[in-house]
């Protein structure tokens, strides 16, 4: 009986240790998944006709915001992966912008998924400078959140409830 209890305790302890073995990158992945889902939903939710909408003179259109997100996250994930991958962000209509956004999300998923706390300390390139992968991927999350904030403002101006506020009174 005591040996079974000891075995169960050891198994439970090792499972808890495994779950916490990559706390930095687990949190990073959680943050990335949250913002990428909001961005994709926001891109899909904005009507096609509003992709040319600009909040003011000198600002990007909604379509340009979506393709900017795709361009930057594609470049950052490529830098973290040690590649020089390019994505076609030249078209800002809804179909093209959402397509390239999905392409860069799929690509970034392949970069975030295998990263561990140890591999996150390996070097990659960000804007031509050597940086730990963690910094590059974390900057992507920061930038995505900043750009999602702009998407939210555009959606609110158009009377559309953004994904992160759906279901709230």
List the model feature ranges, each with a label:
Residues 1-23:
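Bacterial Sec-dependent N-terminal signal peptides
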